[in-house]
């Protein structure tokens, strides 16, 4: 009593404390970063290695395997995958959440160094690593176009100057430049001219390499001067290489230009980038795993004026894609929803109390509690994101509950004629324990969430802490500021002028009288109500099993990604044509704003596209509806497929896949994997629960298999090394020398001129100079025949792997898809040598499914323990928790009604309902117990009186929580797919709970009271008819 009196009788101190909380919250709000979701990115590092001309199998065995063995020893690696394609290997290391990315990077570099001696000597450079997840969608894409600059020159400028500058911006993890390659001097050899001159390809290579040398020459000095020696030992342009003497034939000089075309070109001519319909260089910017996307994008945008100032006038720099506008729009929608919730909650209070002064009290308490929460969020390192703002939106209904309970009880004493300060003190004392019980038991619901591990735990932690802090501040405010304002602002009234007898008050009285009449009937038919209660428990179980489930709601971020997969034997020229055709189809769609894409490099038969949709206000369809519409048009393109998926704010795993979800096949036998993967993929493609089924296993690439006759080679004086060197020189785009320039280093690339390598007959023109100096045609000692070969070789851990990716058709949940896949795998009878498991988001979904029930049970158990401690009873917490089954039924039925799957967001709603609906029972039980102790009433009389006495605050708190959540249900625009499942769950649960618990709670209270008496071997009192 003295504690409450301290604040009631010292209004200045109380007001200043509340002002201090508010000011701290305002400061915290201004300092909080902005993000779409809490920071849940796994630390991911990508290791890259190249060996131009090497086949995928060679890259896998000689490059990937040694690196994997070394990298696999690093502590904290959650998953290691690799993909080896033509001339390149990429290894993705995904670390545990608690692994520091910088420490992991140091370990990765050490592992690369340890494996260096095991790697092929012909690698042009050491393996490198990047602290970025290649499967993440870029946060921004910049494009460079020019009417006068070549693609190679644009690429050089982009990679040498722009990418370096952008990479230095805080938060940027990787700047991937695509669409071309660095400038190079290309030497296109004429096989017939070489044969006529008797010059081998190795001789050409050695001559070029020897003619372009950068070595220190030293200096000459005397007693006065010093001269640095400088020579013309470097060749830098095609014009300087053409007159190079590479051989003498009967005393006549054979120059490079006589046997080859020498041009200023690019390192890899098999690259192409496009933006809309124009050739372009793309700068795809990805953030560091721990970086804030909005801050990073803002940093890039702030740098753009400086970048444009350093760009020549002939180059046009544009932003082709930016993830931040939809994120900002989504957060603005949540903020507006929060404001509407506050207004609706205050309106509910006003309609019940019909007093401006009384309404002003919760109208002050709510903002103080919410704004003060921002200070705690800042101290905890949180951000303003969809989940934390949704937590505050839901908290609106919670924080006003405490104020309502205190205010309503004080108002009841004022209506009875008690003086304001006395009413404030008496009313607060009566409900102080109730308010504390409600708040502590509500916070207890979130304790299991705080202890939950993995990605779901990280994702929900900010939500749980934010809501708990808001409830804690609300508890303090409701026991200090609220009674002080009541005592000094409200006036006592005579019974004949009670406001609740007019308008809404008259309706409330009528409802209360009707409730009293129906409650009398219920208390005289407790068995029927008991059956209804048990029915809700059974219905909960059935609904939870039957409802479709998913991990996270599918978001419409306004950005699509597309993966092109063409015939495995397609040429680069044809692949570039497919890219252009697909881009035209998408560009013509009315909902599309911008399209960029690229192909080439190690992506022999694949490409990537990035599509920016128009803002939600300018299009009628959702991202998924647009994908469904485009899928029909894209399917008509022969020889290739384009798989579209909506970019999500949560992307789990480091695999780059052409669909949102993955199922990975593993085997220690590559032959078994290659045998069963097509069968499994075919079976999964036939499932109606899956769409866009595709695989990263591509074993049907065209290959020309050369078979050496070793006996003939020995007789002719030719070894295998010379033969292999011939093929590498001719067809491997071999980098044979380096040109050093002030800003970068460029390569001299040698190969047979494309004019002479259009078909297989090019092999017939190849020859080797034997030990006797004679030109021996390749056909003399080798035979060749076409065959199939893999375009990529994939590993997970150290096992051969193949990942089948899939999307979900409209109306299908992830749980339905995973069940269909598991059922199909069982029906196929896949041998034990081939193992299947879900990867990425589908894997996390499976783990979350296994822990959902445990989490709900843990929350209920935690609430029971807290309530048991507060009430010093084993029985009363069970009475309070009896309100939960009806809320669960309402929530699950509402989800079914709105055709919304049960997701992580819906799980949050269920957890919130555990905290919300028990408040009704707490108010009933508290007053019933007090009536039994002090009033000498029987349990039947006590619970009946408690139900009638607390009917008004129960209705007020329930309607406040309901109207606080209603804007989430009705919200549209950006991010609504996250908000609506939470609102649907809470509103559905509250409506059903309010209809049932007003009757089931008193019945359960009486049941446990009689059970208590029976176990204590006391005769129960006779039932009193009411």
Curated annotation (Swiss-Prot):
Family label: Belongs to the resistance-nodulation-cell division (RND) (TC 2.A.6) family. MdtC subfamily.
Keywords associated with the record: Cell inner membrane, Cell membrane, Membrane, Transmembrane, Transmembrane helix, Transport
Top-level taxon in the UniProt lineage: Bacteria
GO MF annotation, one: xenobiotic transmembrane transporter activity
Protein's UniProt name: Multidrug resistance protein MdtC
Subcellular location: Cell inner membrane
Keyword Zinc assigned: no
Quaternary assembly: Part of a tripartite efflux system composed of MdtA, MdtB and MdtC. MdtC forms a heteromultimer with MdtB.
HAMAP family referenced in this protein's UniProt entry, alphabetically: MdtC
Keyword flag Thylakoid: no
Species, as recorded: Salmonella newport (strain SL254)
Main location: membrane
Lineage start: Bacteria, Pseudomonadati, Pseudomonadota, Gammaproteobacteria, Enterobacterales
